Amino acid sequence: MRARKPLNWLKQPSGCWPTSSAGSGTRVFKNVFNRATSDSVVRDFRILRSRIILFVTVFLSVLLAANWFVCATWNHFLRMTEMPVWEIIFPGLTLAFVAATLLGRRYSSFGLRLLYRISAVWLGVLNFSFFASCAAWIISAAAALLPVHFEPKIIAEAFFGLAIFTGIYGFVNANRLKIVHVTVNLTNLPIAWRGRTVALVTDLHLGSVRRARFANRVVAKIQCLQPDAVFISGDLFDGPEANPDTLVEPWRKLSAPAGIFYVTGNHEEFGDRAELIDAVQRSGIHVLNNEKVDVHGLQIVGVHDREAGDPRQFRALLQQAELDGSRTSILLAHQPSNLPIAEEMGISLQLSGHTHGGQIWPWTWAATRVHGRFTYGLNRFGNLLVYTSSGAGTWGVPMRVGTKSEIVLIRLADGKGELINYH
C-alpha cells in the first residue's frame, strides 16, 4: 500500500468544499427535468413503457427461438427418440428470467433473487450453446464431404462441452475485479491536482445478483488504492430495490480527501430514481444532481443519464454550468454519447461506462458496432478525452468473456491531453 501524500492542499477556508447545495464552489444547474410539465412526464412514461414492452417481446421471442434451435440440435445429434427433459427445463428457465426480472421491479425476496441468478446463468450457457449448435451443424456437414468418418455425436458433444466450459470460465472471470491504471495529461490542470489519482467505478448493478457483499469488495479495493477522489458513473443499482440503503451501506466505509461523486445511469431509471438518489446521499456520497462543483480549481460536472441522453437537455445543462474554458473540467456521464456536445462545451475529460465492453462474446463485437472505439478505454474526440469503463459488475448474464470487471485508477498530469500510460 502506497503512503498517502500530504493533504495540506485540501486545507481550504470554509465554503470551498463542494456541497450538494448552491454556494461557494458549487453551481447547481437549473434543473431542466424539474420544469417538465405533468403532460410531458406522462408522455415520457408512456414512451418508456412502450419501449419496455417492445424490448421484452422481442427479447423473449429471440430467446425462445434460440432455445428451440439448441434443443433441436441436441435431439438430432444425440439421436433422442422421446422428448427429453431439457425441452421443458431450458425454455422454462428462459421464461423464469423474464418473469424474475419483471417481478423484481415490485418485489424483493431471496427466492426471487435465486430464481433470477439460476436463470441468468442459463442465459449465458444458452448464448454459447447457440453458437456451439451452429458450429456442430457446420462441422458435421463439412465432415460428410471428407473421406474420413467423424461421428456426429462426438462432434456435438465436443462443442457443447466447450460451451459449458466457456460459461464456467465467464462466470469465474466476471467475479475477478481487476485494477486498470491510466495516466492522462490534461491541459491547464490545476497545480493542486497534478500527480493526484482518481478512481472510476461504474456499472456495479447492485440488486438481484450482486448484493452488499460485492459492494464491500469494491469498496475495499478502492480504499487500498487510496485515491484522492472517487467517481461513480452510473448503474450503481440494477433497477428497483426494496431496501437500497442496505446495498449502499458499504460505501460509508469509503473515504477520499476530495470527495466521492455519483451520477445515475439508465438502470436507475427503471426504479424510483429519487429514492435511489436519497439512499446514495445518506451514505455520504455527493450526488451530482446535474451540477458543477469546483474542487481546488478542478471543475467536476455531473449529468444524470436521463438528461444526458437528450441532446437538447444535455446542451442546455452544460451551458447553464457556465464552464470556464481556460480551466480543466471532468464530466461524469453514464453513456459515452453526445460527445460532440461535450467537446463543444469545453469538457476536458469525460468518464463513462454503460457498454460493459460488450460483456460476453460475441456481443463484444456488437457493442463496437454501436459505440465504435468509445466502447472501451481511453480515446479522443477532438479536444475531448473519453474514458469508457467496462464496469465492475454485470447485467443479466453474470459472465464475462472477452472483457473484464474493472476499477480504474487514473493519475492526472498536466499536459496536452494525451495518453501517457495505460496498463
Please give the residue ranges for each predicted region.
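Non-catalytic terminal accessory segments
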Residues: 1, 15-18, 23-175, 417-421
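A broad, low-specificity signal marking well-ordered, structured residues that form hydrophobic/aromatic
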Residues: 42, 166, 182, 298, ...
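N-terminal signal-anchor transmembrane helix
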Residues: 112-116, 145-162, 170-200, 207-224
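Soluble catalytic domains of enzymes that build or remodel membrane lipids, polysaccharides, and related
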Residues: 185-423
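Long, contiguous hydrophobic alpha-helical segments, chiefly transmembrane helices and signal peptides
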Residues: 120-133, 177, 215, 303, ...
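Catalytic cores of secreted/periplasmic lytic hydrolases that degrade extracellular macromolecules
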Residues: 6
